Amino acid sequence: MALGLFTLQLVSAVNQSLSNAKVSAEVSRQVIQDVKDGTVTFNLLAYTLMSLFVVYFALFKARSHRGRAALIVFKILILFVYVPLLYWSQAYIYATLIAVILLGRFFHTAWHCWLYKTWDFIVFNVTTLCYAR
């Protein structure tokens, strides 16, 4: 299931439906091939939308203290709960893409934290000079 989250479920549902309908082997092969072509197209669209969302999520800056705290918690949960769950369900490309984007942004802001000796860069999710009130 390396192509995406729903590919395996869709193909298995089609296989089960074809076996229940008792169609010929030739028709069955043709339907399965058509479904695989459709899932590849669906996965390309899903990858694009997912990667745009993850980049937006990685770069988003909340305005309130509660929002900033929630974003940090969500990013940690995504990295330590959701990404391993994706790897476990064999969605390797999704998991790797999410982990690389979020860790890349974290390390980019962490570099500025180390350089200027303040945690505000990670808290505010910015890389420009940042001063807390």
Swiss-Prot record:
PROSITE patterns named in the record: COV_VIROPORIN_3A_TM (PS51966)
UniProt entry keywords in alphabetical sequence: Host membrane, Membrane, Signal, Transmembrane, Transmembrane helix
Coiled coil: none
Protein localization: Host membrane
TM stretches of this protein: 40-60, 69-89, 91-111
Membrane topology: Multi-pass membrane protein
Extent of the signal sequence: 1-21
Main localization category: host cell
Gene Ontology CC entries for this record: host cell membrane; membrane
InterPro entries membership: a/bCoV_VIROPORIN_3A-like_TM (IPR046445), Coronavirus_Orf3a/b (IPR004293)
Keyword Signal in record: yes
Family note: Belongs to the coronaviruses NS4a protein family.
Protein name in UniProt: Non-structural protein 4a
Originating species: Human coronavirus 229E
